[in-house]
Regions:
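Bacterial Sec-dependent N-terminal signal peptides
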Residues: 1-24
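Aromatic-residue detector
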Residues: 2-5, 34-36, 137-144
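Mixed-charge, low-complexity intrinsically disordered regions
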Residues: 105-106, 115
Length: 295
């Protein structure tokens, strides 16, 4: 009898947890300002790099359909001096100090970038200067990739679509507009270019998500070829011609997992976020941890 009561209680608790739905719609009003500090640690190619930054989100406009949220990052700091850190510095300097004007719906979900043409022009200008510095400081990079190929890599990650996908993957605005229940799932593309399936668990104002790779064999082949074309264009044709054999060998296998935890404040804005990501693409392992804290 006691066992039956216990089982009934556990079943009821499970149903209550599953029935809980968290609608993420932060308080938005013209003039609202939120500031955050972010610390990101990246381990790759035998290196360990930590990047810190501050970011400010300001609701600058109220529109018929939603809002405009300005986001600007500053005070970037990188603690290491190696190839990975140089590339991270280049990536951060591409966006540091640039004001991104996100057009959102009523719930704060990002739909487009109002000043994208201006943002793109500034990033392209910075890319030229940064690439010159990279080729000067790391001439070995120039032996593999030309200046044009490097710029193509930098700018490929800065299309409006790519930037919005990045925002919706992880970060302060990632959950906005979602009605999340335990067991719910969605899909996104992570920073490594892998399609991921994400599962959610809700507990009050806390949301945990666990993500795994969700790619077909054809998706995997396409991603691998694109990456080879970016980092080793001279070998791209060889990889294309032998892609099936290479995939079967496991040399080009791509794996990845991500786990994120969000805690929302009473106003619906993110209070804290932590993210752990591990990936292995073409035998190269990368581990990333990130913490974002509201100030």
């Amino acid at each position: 009898m006691k066992k039956m009561i216990l089982m009934s209680t556990l079943l009821l608790m499970t149903c209550l947890v599953q029935a809980q739905i968290l609608n993420v719609s932060p308080t938005l009003k013209k003039g609202n300002v939120m500031t955050y500090k972010s610390t990101t640690n990246v381990k790759a190619s035998g290196t360990d790099v930590t990047v810190t930054e501050n970011s400010k989100y300001t609701v600058t406009e109220e529109t018929k359909d939603g809002f405009v949220i300005d986001m600007i990052s500053s005070d970037w700091n990188v603690n290491s001096d190696n190839m990975v850190s140089h590339l991270l510095v280049a990536a951060t300097e591409m966006v540091s100090g640039i004001n991104f004007r996100f057009i959102t719906d009523k719930s704060g979900q990002v739909k487009s970038i109002k000043n994208y043409d201006e943002v793109k022009a500034k990033m392209a200008e910075r890319a030229d200067k940064l690439i010159e510095g990279i080729l000067k400081d790391m001439p070995e990079v120039g032996q593999v990739l030309s200046k044009d190929q490097l710029k193509e890599q930098f700018m490929g990650a800065t299309t409006e679509e790519a930037l919005i996908k990045s925002i919706k993957a992880n970060g302060v605005l990632a959950l906005n507009g979602k009605a999340i229940a335990s067991g719910a799932q969605d899909e996104y593309v992570n920073s490594q270019g892998m399609k991921m399936k994400r599962f959610f668990l809700v507990n009050g104002k806390k949301v945990t998500s666990t993500s795994t790779v969700n790619m077909t064999q054809d998706d995997m082949k396409k991603m691998i070829i694109e990456k080879v074309e970016q980092i080793a264009p001279a070998q791209a044709q060889m990889v294309k011609d032998n892609i099936d054999t290479l995939m079967e060998s496991g040399l080009l296998k791509a794996e990845g997992t991500e786990k994120s935890s969000y805690e929302l404040a009473d106003d619906g804005w993110v209070k804290t976020m932590t993210m752990e990501s591990n990936s292995k693409v073409m035998q190269q392992e990368t581990s990333t941890t990130q913490t974002i804290t509201r100030q």
